C-alpha cells in the first residue's frame, strides 16, 4: 500500500494501495479517505492506477461514502479468499486483497472510519437503526474486526455482525410471505434480518431462537424456522454467489447461535439442568408421539441450546468444548433428521437411571419427537472427558455445515447434554422427554407423572399409565392396574391410591428392591400404538429386555378380594412384557402362584388375570367365587365375568386354544367350554367328544349330579387332564355365550380344582351366537321348568338334560343345540336321566356329543335374545334357587336344525309325510347309534324330528321300515339323524318335524327341500292322516286324554302340542317362526327377535303375520311360499292366517296367542300348517312356553293334574295364559326345545 502523501491534498488519506475487483480481478488503486472539512465525509475511492490519483488528472473511478455503507465485512469466495465487502443500501461492493494481512489492514481501516462516520452521522442525523455501525466484534475465527478502537465517545449504531446479499427464492416462506428477490441477510447477536435492497427497514426479523435448523447445498442456503417465528414455521431458501459463501453463512450463523447459547447457559443451568433431582414440572404431554409442539416443551426455548457442549468443528480443534450449543426441542426439530452426538455426557443423576439407560443403543436419534422438553444438562454436569466429537453433518449434508446441526440437532436428543451414543447417557430431565432418553423416545413423551418423581425413582414413576401387566399375589392393584411386576411375583406395584407420579408404595422386601423397581419401572404411554418402552434396566426379576416392538399386555388388575371382583391373576406379566406367546418380545413374568400345576383360580387362590381389560360398561370383575378365568371378555348383555387373558391362553389353560389355533371366544357368563366342574366326573362321556366332527363339540356346564344324567360314553374324554385338546377339525370359533351363569363365568368354563381331570373339549365350533338369555322372572322354579329334549340320533348324541341354570343360553345348549342335545340313551339306562335335573345342577350336553368319534355339527345358530344389546353387559346372575331347566332358546333367525320331537305316545300322528322325499329317520333312543356312515351327510345341518315315539306312524310317514328296531320306549326320544341309507332331499337347513303325542305320528321328516325350515307339525289326532287339512278341537282333546295322565303326560303332550300352539300342532308356523302361543302375550304380531314389547330385529327372512280370524285348515300352511308344498291339503286360508308381508324383515312372525289356540276350545286353529312351511318361512321361532302348573286345562280339555310346565318351551305355550316367563327374554328365534317330563317314560 502506498504511503499517503504528506501534502495538503492528501492530508485526509488514511490508506492507499492496489486491490482487485473480485469479478474482473483487475487491479485498481484504492484510496481510503477520512472525513475532513475540506474533502468531505470519509470515503473509499479507487482509481485506474496510482499515477492518476497522484496527478489528480482525473476524478476517481468510484467513491463510496462510508456513511452510506450498510455494513463492512470480510468475505471469501471460490475465487478470492481475502475479500472485504461493503454493503450499501443499493449495492454490494467488494475488494480482494492478495493476503490475509492486507485484507485485515484494509478491513480495520475501513471499519474505523465507518464507525466514526456512522457515529457522526447518527449523532447528526439521529439515524440509529439500520446503520452499518462498525461491524461489531464477531466471534473469534470469523475474521471480523474486534471492537471499534477509535469510537471516541460516539457509541456505534446497532451493528450487524454479518451481512450477506442473497436472492430469496420463491420457495417455502419466501413464496408464502412474498419475500422474493435481492435481500441482505443481516446477522446480529440475537437476530437475523432480511433487508430488501434499497430499503432501510428490515422486512423480516427472525430470532435466532426461532431457527430450527439451517443448512446449505451448493450455492443455496436455507433456514428453517419454527412456529414461534413471526413468519410461522417454514423455510427460507436463498441463493448466494457460490457454495463457499453458503458454507460461510452456515458456519457463521451456527456460531452466532452457539454464542447465544453460551450467553444463556448460566440461567438455564440454574433452572433445571444443573440439578437432575429437582426436575421442573412440565405440562402434560400431548399425544404428539414424536413432535410435541414447542409450546409443550416446558423450558424456555433457550434451554434448547444450552445443555449440549458440543463444539463446532473449529472449536473442536481448538475451541472450548463447552461453547458448542446443541439445540433442543424448539431449535431443531428440523435437525431431527441429523444425528448430533453431543460431546459431553452428563453425570448420570442416579445410578439407576444411568444404568437403566445403559442398555439402550447408542445414539438413538429420535425424530423431532423429542423436542419435547429435553431439559439439557448444563455443561457442568457433563463430564468433559466423555465428550465425543459432534457429528457435524448438517442437514444439507455438507461437511462443515454440520456444525449447525450439532448446534441445533433440533431433536431434543441433541439438547440433552450427553451424547445419545453414550450408553450411560441420561437426559437430565426426569421426564425422559429428551430424545436421548430412550424412554421418552418411544413413549409418546409423557412427562406428566414424572413431574414429581424423584429422579432416584428411576422410571418407576414414569409408568403413570395403567400397568396392564402382572400383579402381586397379595397386594391390591391400583384401580388402574398399576403393577410393577417382579418376575418372581414380588408384585411390586403402585398401591392403588398411589399417584402415578409419586414413588410407589413398596410392600415387604419391595422397599429393599426399590432400585430394581425403579429400573424395572417403565413408563407407559397413552397410546398403545407406540412401541412400549422396554424395561430400561434388566432387573433380576426380569429375564430379558423386551424389544421395543413388544405389544402391551393389557391386563386389568382388580383388588384381590372376593365378590368385589378383585381378581388378581395367578400371575401377571409385566406391563409391557408379553406373555410366553411372544417370547421374543420381552420379559415374561412367571405366575405368582400355580397350585398343583393346575390353574386353580378360586376365591382362595389368585385369580388368573384377564387377557382383556374390561371395556364393557357393565362388566364387573368376576367375584372370587368364580373358579377360573374365561378366555374372552363377555360380550353378552348379561355377562358378569371380566375378560380373561387371551394373550397366552395356553400358558394359563392349554385347553383354551383349540388345536386349530382358535381362541375360545365364548362370551357367556359361563365360559363356552362349559365344564361339568362338579364333583361327579361321570360325565366323561359328555366330555368325550369325537375329535373328527368339524362343528359340534359336546361339553357339560353342569355340576355334580348332572354328570349322572349324561350317559356314559365309551370314548375317553377328548381332552386329557393336562388340558390338551384332541385335534378337532371344527372351522368355527365358538363365539356363543355359555349358559351356566350362576356357577360359571368365563373363568368358570374350566373345571374346578376339585375336578381338574374333567376337562371339556374346547374345540366345539358353533356358528357364532350373540347372546344368552337369563332367567325370566316368571319362570317356574326347580323341576317345574325342567325339560328334556332328547334328540336321539342314530349317531348317538348325548341326551340333553337341561336344568334351570341352563336357561342362560350357552354355546352348548344354544348355539350347539346343547339345550336340545340329542343323546343316545343306553338301553340299560333308565329314563330318570331324562327326568328333571337338580335345579342347582346345571347341565348342558352339546348336541355335538360323540358321534362315532366325530363332533356333531351345531344344531342351531342363535343370535341372542330379543333384548340382547350389542354392548356387552354384565349378565345378570341367575338365581340358583330358580334355575331354568329348559335349555336356552336358540336366538338365531335360522336354527339350521332338523328337529324331530319324539313322544312316548302309543302312535305317531300320521302327518302329511307322503311328499317327504327324505324321510326323517326316527330311531328310538334305545336303538344303537347308527354308524357314522349311516348318518346322512347330505342334510345341511341337523334335523330334529319332534314326534311321539311310535315307529308305526314313523314307518308310515318316513317309509323307512324301522319296525325291526322295535317300538321306542315311551321315554325314548325318537330322534335319529336320517341315515345315508335313507334317501332324502334334505331341507336346506332345518326340517322341523313336530308331531303331537298321539298314536298317529305325523312324520316330519325333511320333505321337499325346504329352503330353511321344513316344519312338520303332527296333529294331535289319530284320525289325522298325511295331508289332513283340518284338525278338530276334539282331536286335541283326545290327544290330551291319550297322552299319559299326570303332570308328565300333560307336560309331554303340552310340550309337543303347545309347541305348535296347542295340541293342534304347529299351526302355520315355519320351523323358526317364533309363535307366540301364550294367550297372555301381546296379541299383536311381533317381530321375531324382538320381545313382545316391540323390540324388533330384522333378519333375512320374510315377514309373516298371522291373522286370528282365519283358522288353519291344512296341515300345510304355505308360510313362506303361500302354497302347501308337500301338504296335499295345504289350505289357502292358512295363507291369510299367516299374512305374508312383503317386507323381508322377520317382523310379525309372532302368531297371536288367540289365533294360535290361546284357549282350549280353539285348538283347531293351529291346524297343521306344517306342509306349507316347507317352502316358505326361512326362520321361524316357536314361542311355545306353557306354564302347565298354572293352566293345565288349556292344554287338554280333560282335567289332569297340572303337569309341570314343559320346560323350556320357548316363550309361552299358546294355551298357557299364565306363561309370563318374560318370554320376551327368551330367544326370538327357533328355540324349539320341547322335552317332556319323562316320568311317564320310565
Curated annotation (Swiss-Prot):
Which residues get modified to Phosphotyrosine? 465, 612, 632, 662, 896, 941, 989, 1179, 1229
Q: Which InterPro entries match?
A: IRS (IPR039011), IRS_PTB (IPR002404), PH-like_dom_sf (IPR011993), PH_domain (IPR001849)
The signal peptide here is none
Provide the effect of residue 632 to F. Does not affect IRS1 stability
Protein location: Cytoplasm; Nucleus
**One example GO MF annotation:** phosphotyrosine residue binding
Query: What about PTM?
Result: Serine phosphorylation of IRS1 is a mechanism for insulin resistance. Ser-307, Ser-312, Ser-315, and Ser-323 phosphorylations inhibit insulin action through disruption of IRS1 interaction with the insulin receptor INSR. Phosphorylation of Tyr-896 is required for GRB2-binding. Phosphorylated by ALK. Phosphorylated at Ser-270, Ser-307, Ser-636 and Ser-1101 by RPS6KB1; phosphorylation induces accelerated degradation of IRS1. Phosphorylated on tyrosine residues in response to insulin. Ubiquitinated by the Cul7-RING(FBXW8) complex in a mTOR-dependent manner, leading to its degradation: the Cul7-RING(FBXW8) complex recognizes and binds IRS1 previously phosphorylated by S6 kinase (RPS6KB1 or RPS6KB2). Ubiquitinated by TRAF4 through 'Lys-29' linkage; this ubiquitination regulates the interaction of IRS1 with IGFR and IRS1 tyrosine phosphorylation upon IGF1 stimulation.
Chain span(s) of sequence motif YXXM motif 3: 612-615
- Compositional bias of kind Basic and acidic residues: 592-610, 776-785
Q: Where is this protein primarily located?
A: cytoplasm
| CDD domains associated with the record | PH_IRS, PTB_IRS
Stated consequence of mutating residue 612 to F: Induces IRS1 degradation
Query: What result follows from mutating residue 307 to A?
Result: Impaired degradation by the Cul7-RING(FBXW8) complex
Q: Region (GRB2-binding): which ranges?
A: 896-898
Q: Where is this motif: YXXM motif 2?
A: 551-554
Residues modified as Phosphoserine are: 3, 99, 270, 307, 312, 315, 323, 330, 345, 348, 419, 527, 616, 629, 636, 794, 892, 1100-1101
Q: What is the effect of changing residue 639 to A?
A: Impaired degradation by the Cul7-RING(FBXW8) complex
Q: Does the keyword Transport apply?
A: no
Compositionally biased region (Polar residues): 918-928, 1073-1085, 1102-1114
Tell me a GO biological process for this protein.
phosphatidylinositol 3-kinase/protein kinase B signal transduction
| Extent of motif YXXM motif 1 | 465-468
What's this protein's name?
A: Insulin receptor substrate 1
Organism, scientific name: Homo sapiens
Its lineage reads:
Eukaryota, Metazoa, Chordata, Craniata, Vertebrata
Q: Gene name, please?
A: IRS1
Amino acid at each position: 500500500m502506498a504511503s499517503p502523501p504528506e501534502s495538503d491534498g492528501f492530508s485526509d488519506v488514511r490508506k492507499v494501495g492496489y486491490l482487485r475487483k473480485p469479478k474482473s480481478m483487475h487491479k485498481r488503486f484504492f484510496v481510503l479517505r477520512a472525513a475532513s472539512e475540506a474533502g468531505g465525509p470519509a470515503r473509499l475511492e479507487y482509481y485506474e492506477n496510482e499515477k492518476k490519483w497522484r496527478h489528480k488528472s482525473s476524478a476517481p473511478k468510484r467513491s463510496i461514502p462510508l456513511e452510506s455503507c450498510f455494513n463492512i465485512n470480510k468475505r471469501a469466495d471460490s475465487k478470492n479468499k481475502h475479500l472485504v465487502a461493503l454493503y450499501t443500501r443499493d449495492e454490494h461492493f467488494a475488494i480482494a486483497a492478495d493476503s490475509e494481512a492486507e485484507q485485515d489492514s484494509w478491513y480495520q481501516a475501513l471499519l474505523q472510519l465507518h464507525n466514526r462516520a456512522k457515529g457522526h452521522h447518527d449523532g447528526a442525523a439521529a439515524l440509529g437503526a439500520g446503520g452499518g455501525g462498525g461491524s461489531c466484534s464477531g466471534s473469534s475465527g470469523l475474521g471480523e474486526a474486534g471492537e471499534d478502537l477509535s469510537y471516541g465517545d460516539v457509541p456505534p449504531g446497532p451493528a450487524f455482525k454479518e451481512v450477506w446479499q442473497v436472492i430469496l427464492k420463491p420457495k417455502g416462506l419466501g413464496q408464502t410471505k412474498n419475500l422474493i428477490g435481492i435481500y441482505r441477510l443481516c446477522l446480529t447477536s440475537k437476530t437475523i434480518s432480511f433487508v430488501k435492497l434499497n430499503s432501510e427497514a428490515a422486512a423480516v426479523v427472525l430470532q435466532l431462537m426461532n431457527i430450527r435448523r439451517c443448512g446449505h447445498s451448493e450455492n443455496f442456503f436455507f433456514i428453517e424456522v419454527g412456529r414461534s417465528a413471526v413468519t410461522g414455521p417454514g423455510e427460507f431458501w436463498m441463493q448466494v454467489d457460490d457454495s463457499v459463501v453458503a458454507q460461510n453463512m452456515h458456519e457463521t450463523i451456527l456460531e452466532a447461535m452457539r454464542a447465544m447459547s453460551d450467553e444463556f447457559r448460566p440461567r438455564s443451568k440454574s433452572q433445571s439442568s444443573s440439578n437432575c433431582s429437582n426436575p421442573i414440572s412440565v405440562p402434560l404431554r400431548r399425544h404428539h408421539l414424536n413432535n410435541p409442539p414447542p409450546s409443550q416443551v416446558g423450558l424456555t426455548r433457550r434451554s434448547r441450546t444450552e445443555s449440549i457442549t458440543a463444539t463446532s468443528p473449529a472449536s473442536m480443534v481448538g475451541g472450548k468444548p463447552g461453547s458448542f450449543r446443541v439445540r433442543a426441542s424448539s431449535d431443531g426439530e428440523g435437525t431431527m433428521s441429523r444425528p448430533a452426538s453431543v460431546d459431553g455426557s452428563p453425570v448420570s443423576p442416579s445410578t439407576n437411571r444411568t444404568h437403566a439407560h445403559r442398555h439402550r443403543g447408542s445414539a438413538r436419534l429420535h425424530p423431532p419427537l423429542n423436542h419435547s422438553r429435553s431439559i439439557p444438562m448444563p455443561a457442568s454436569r457433563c463430564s468433559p472427558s466423555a465428550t465425543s466429537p459432534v457429528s457435524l453433518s448438517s442437514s444439507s449434508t455438507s461437511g462443515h455445515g454440520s456444525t449447525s446441526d450439532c448446534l441445533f440437532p433440533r431433536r431434543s436428543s441433541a439438547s440433552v447434554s450427553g451424547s445419545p451414543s453414550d450408553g450411560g447417557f441420561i437426559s437430565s430431565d426426569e421426564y425422559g422427554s429428551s430424545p436421548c432418553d430412550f424412554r421418552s423416545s418411544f413413549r409418546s413423551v409423557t412427562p406428566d407423572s414424572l413431574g414429581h418423581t424423584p429422579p432416584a425413582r428411576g422410571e418407576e414413576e414414569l409408568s403413570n399409565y395403567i400397568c396392564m401387566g402382572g400383579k402381586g399375589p397379595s397386594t391390591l392393584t391400583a384401580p388402574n392396574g398399576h403393577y410393577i411386576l417382579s418376575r418372581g411375583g414380588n408384585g411390586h406395584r403402585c398401591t392403588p391410591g398411589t399417584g402415578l407420579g409419586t414413588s410407589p408404595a413398596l410392600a415387604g422386601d419391595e422397599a429393599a428392591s426399590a432400585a430394581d423397581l425403579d429400573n424395572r419401572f417403565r413408563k407407559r404411554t397413552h397410546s398403545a400404538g407406540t412401541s412400549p418402552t422396554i424395561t430400561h434396566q434388566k432387573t433380576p426379576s426380569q429375564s430379558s429386555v423386551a424389544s421395543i416392538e413388544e405389544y402391551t399386555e393389557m391386563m386389568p388388575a382388580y383388588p384381590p378380594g372376593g365378590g368385589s371382583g378383585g381378581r388378581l391373576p395367578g400371575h401377571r406379566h409385566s406391563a409391557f412384557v408379553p406373555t410366553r406367546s411372544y417370547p421374543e418380545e420381552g420379559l415374561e413374568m412367571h405366575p405368582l402362584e400355580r397350585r398343583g400345576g393346575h390353574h386353580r383360580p378360586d376365591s382362595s387362590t389368585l385369580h388368573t388375570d384377564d387377557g382383556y381389560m374390561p371395556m364393557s360398561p357393565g362388566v364387573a370383575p368376576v367375584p372370587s367365587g368364580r373358579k377360573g378365568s374365561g378366555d374372552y371378555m363377555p360380550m353378552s348383555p348379561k355377562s358378569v365375568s371380566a375378560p380373561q387373558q387371551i394373550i397366552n391362553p395356553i400358558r394359563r389353560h392349554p385347553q383354551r386354544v383349540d388345536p386349530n389355533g382358535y381362541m375360545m371366544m365364548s362370551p357367556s357368563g359361563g365360559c363356552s367350554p362349559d365344564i361339568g366342574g362338579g364333583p361327579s366326573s361321570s360325565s366323561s362321556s359328555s366330555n368325550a367328544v369325537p375329535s373328527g366332527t368339524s362343528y359340534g363339540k359336546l361339553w357339560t356346564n353342569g355340576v355334580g349330579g348332572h354328570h349322572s344324567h349324561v350317559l356314559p360314553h365309551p370314548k375317553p374324554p377328548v381332552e386329557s387332564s393336562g388340558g390338551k385338546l384332541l385335534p378337532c377339525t371344527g372351522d368355527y370359533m365358538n363365539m356363543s355365550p355359555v349358559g351356566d351363569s350362576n356357577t360359571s363365568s368365563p373363568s368358570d368354563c374350566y373345571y374346578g380344582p376339585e375336578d381338574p381331570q374333567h376337562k371339556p373339549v374346547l374345540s366345539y365350533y358353533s356358528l357364532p351366537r350373540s347372546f344368552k338369555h337369563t332367567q325370566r322372572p316368571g319362570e317356574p322354579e326347580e323341576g317345574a321348568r325342567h325339560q328334556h329334549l332328547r334328540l336321539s340320533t342314530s349317531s348317538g348324541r348325548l341326551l340333553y338334560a337341561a336344568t334351570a341354570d341352563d336357561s342362560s343360553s350357552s354355546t352348548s345348549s344354544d348355539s350347539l343345540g346343547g339345550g336340545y342335545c340329542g343323546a343316545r340313551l343306553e338301553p340299560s339306562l333308565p329314563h330318570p336321566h331324562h327326568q328333571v335335573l337338580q335345579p342347582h345342577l346345571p347341565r348342558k350336553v352339546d348336541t355335538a356329543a360323540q358321534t362315532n368319534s366325530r363332533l356333531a355339527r351345531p344344531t342351531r345358530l342363535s343370535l341372542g335374545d330379543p333384548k340382547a344389546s350389542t354392548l356387552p353387559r354384565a349378565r345378570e346372575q341367575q338365581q340358583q334357587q330358580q334355575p331354568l331347566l329348559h335349555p336356552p332358546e336358540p336366538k338365531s333367525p335360522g336354527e339350521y336344525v332338523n328337529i324331530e320331537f319324539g313322544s312316548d305316545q302309543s302312535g305317531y300322528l300320521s302327518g302329511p309325510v307322503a311328499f317327504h322325499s327324505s324321510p326323517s329317520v326316527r330311531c328310538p333312543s334305545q336303538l344303537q347309534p347308527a354308524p357314522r356312515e349311516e348318518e346322512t351327510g347330505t342334510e345341511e345341518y341337523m334335523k330334529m324330528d319332534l314326534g311321539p315315539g311310535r315307529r308305526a306312524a314313523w314307518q308310515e310317514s318316513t317309509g323307512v321300515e324301522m319296525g325291526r328296531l322295535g317300538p321306542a320306549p315311551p321315554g325314548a326320544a325318537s330322534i335319529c339323524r336320517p341315515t345315508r341309507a335313507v334317501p332324502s332331499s334334505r331341507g336346506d337347513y332345518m326340517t322341523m318335524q313336530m308331531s303331537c303325542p298321539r298314536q298317529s305320528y305325523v312324520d316330519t321328516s325333511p320333505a321337499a327341500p325346504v329352503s330353511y325350515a321344513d316344519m312338520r307339525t303332527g296333529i294331535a289326532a289319530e284320525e289325522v292322516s298325511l295331508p289332513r287339512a283340518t284338525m278338530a278341537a276334539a282331536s286335541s282333546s283326545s290327544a290330551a286324554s291319550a297322552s299319559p295322565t299326570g303332570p308328565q303326560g300333560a307336560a309331554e303332550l303340552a310340550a309337543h302340542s303347545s309347541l305348535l300352539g296347542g295340541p293342534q300342532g304347529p299351526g302355520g308356523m315355519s320351523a323358526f317362526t317364533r309363535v307366540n302361543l301364550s294367550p297372555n302375550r301381546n296379541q299383536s304380531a311381533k317381530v321375531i327377535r324382538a320381545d313382545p314389547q316391540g323390540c324388533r330385529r330384522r333378519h333375512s327372512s320374510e315377514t309373516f303375520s298371522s291373522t286370528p280370524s282365519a283358522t288353519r285348515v291344512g296341515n300345510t300352511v304355505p308360510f313362506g311360499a303361500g302354497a302347501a308344498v308337500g301338504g296335499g291339503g295345504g289350505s289357502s286360508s292358512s295363507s291369510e292366517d299367516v299374512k305374508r308381508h312383503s317386507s323381508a324383515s322377520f317382523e310379525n312372525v309372532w302368531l297371536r296367542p288367540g289365533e294360535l289356540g290361546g284357549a282350549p276350545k280353539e285348538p283347531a286353529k293351529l291346524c297343521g300348517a306344517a306342509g306349507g312351511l316347507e317352502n316358505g318361512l326361512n326362520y321361524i321361532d316357536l314361542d311355545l312356553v306353557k306354564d302347565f302348573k298354572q293352566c293345565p286345562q288349556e292344554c287338554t280339555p280333560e282335567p289332569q293334574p297340572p303337569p309341570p310346565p314343559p320346560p323350556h318351551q320357548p316363550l309361552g305355550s299358546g294355551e298357557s295364559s299364565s306363561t309370563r316367563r318374560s318370554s320376551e327374554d327368551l330367544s326370538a328365534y327357533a328355540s324349539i326345545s320341547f322335552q317332556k317330563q319323562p316320568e311317564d317314560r320310565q
